[in-house]
Each structure stands twice: as structure tokens, then as C-alpha cells.
Amino acid sequence: MICKNVQALTAYTPGEQPKDAGIIKLNTNENPYPPSPKVAEALRTFDAARLRLYLDPVFMALRLRIAEIHGCTAEQVFIGNGSDEILALCTRAFVENDGSVGYFVPSYSLYPVLADIRGVTRRPVALGSGFTWRAPADDAASLFFITNPNAPTSLLHDKASVAAFCRTFRGVVL
């Protein structure tokens, strides 16, 4: 019943999770700061009865606002249930059955898992000294993930470097 490539996956092993409730786990993106006063007020005035209703399935109001902020159209804005879902959907949409997924290493550990779930070739590209890279790192991949800033190195790649990579890469860059 379950695809062979999914059966072959290794289960994710989370890092140590301290039991002390007072510890903020930055490694799992917990935030040491309280929400802003605007968020706190929105939560105080939120009608919990609305949770039983579906939202606008295309999130048009949100997409329009994001488009306005970033100078694009709502049709160019994609909304999902977190970045992991969006990355998984892009892997399905942009990578054919005989395609491949490229990514830098070290980087986000989900990228090779997405390739494995999709049943396509992984194309990891080692970062150079100082965790640097140059374009194109690997132009044979169908889809190439660039994490910016990179995790776990935290290095931020400048806009010009990412744009140069996108211009020379023949596949899709996320």
C-alpha cells in the first residue's frame, strides 16, 4: 500500500528536547518574546466560533495585501500551511518523475527528504570554504533550493548573488 520510496525513508529524529518548561527552544523556532500588542489585542477580540468555518480557500485578501507590499500581483503570491507544505507542493509541481532536486549542504534537512518522498534523485552541492557558493552550482537539477539566510550557517546571500544564480540556472529556483 505504501510506496517503496516512502517505506525506505528514515524517521526524523528530533534533537534533545529539554523538559524544563522555562527553557525556550530556539532550535525549534520557539520565540523568547511575547506577541506584539497588536497581535495580543487581535487574539483577545477573536471570535472563537469562527474556527468552525472554512476561510477563503484562495486567501484573496491576504494575497492582495502581500502583493501590494511586494509590488507584484495577487496571482504571483502563493499561500500555504507553512513553508514545509509549500516546499513539498513545489517539489511535486516542478520535478518530473525522472527529475532531481538540488540543494546546498549543509542546509535545511527537509530538502533530501522531499526528494526521497518524491522518488527523485538528490543533487546535494557542498558549500565552499566559508560556506560560500557560486552560480550555477548544479544546472542538472530540475529544482534547486536556496535557503537564505542559510540554515544552519546563518549566512545571508546578497540579492545580487541569488539573482545571478537564478539567471544562469535552467530549472526552478526556490
Feature map (PLM): residue ranges:
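N-terminal "arm"/small-domain region of PLP-dependent enzymes with the aminotransferase-like
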Residues: M1-L53, D139-N148
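Hydrophobic/aromatic ligand-binding patch that stacks against planar heteroaromatic rings
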Residues: L114-A115, F165
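Active-site phosphate-binding strand-loop segment of PLP-dependent enzymes
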Residues: G128-L174
